[in-house]
Amino acid sequence: ARDPFEFIWIDEGAADMAAYLCFGVTNTLTGHANAWSQNSNMSVRWWNQRIADYGAGFLFMMYLSDKLGGASSISTLVANTDTGGSAIEDLASNAPPGSTPIGTTMSDIFANFTLAVSIDSDQGAFGFSNLDLSTGCISAFICKAQMSGFNDQWVNPWTSPLQELEGWGVRAYKFNQGSGAPLNIMAQPSEFGFEGALL
């Protein structure tokens, strides 16, 4: 291996990406990707050998490849002896001309990935051009991160019950049909000492 000490989530994400490049979307890949998309509160970076862990790594590696130069960017990442987020930050900081800016810190890169996997927009960093993500999770298609909750009725205050979230995981909510009044959001953590972002 060119980088024998790389973190497993990157190795397995690259392995699933190689399978995609060789065989296209298979039942195994949709199973991996959709397991995470349906449970995106699971960490992209913490490896617990769950099916969703493979899918998280695959989607993140596909995002990096799409935005930072394709196969050559993944070759650069694999050859980099730094591991994990450090190698990814190096790649993003030294992206080839024509790459889509996605940030240069893991926090910024992950925030842009979060938007891309949640909405799959055609705009810059906020979608995938190398995958066609479907709204619903069905076996033949790779789906977007599924909403953790939604609200389209504004008669009463809306709350979401306890939502667990691992570090480097995602929770996505949809709000629509509001009055145009400011939206106030309050999150109450059960653990302290962690950073998070509302996008």
Region locations from a protein language model:
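Active-site-proximal alpha-helical
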Residues: S37-I119
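Short, isolated positions within intrinsically disordered regulatory regions of eukaryotic proteins
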Residues: G13, S40, R50-I51, W158, ...
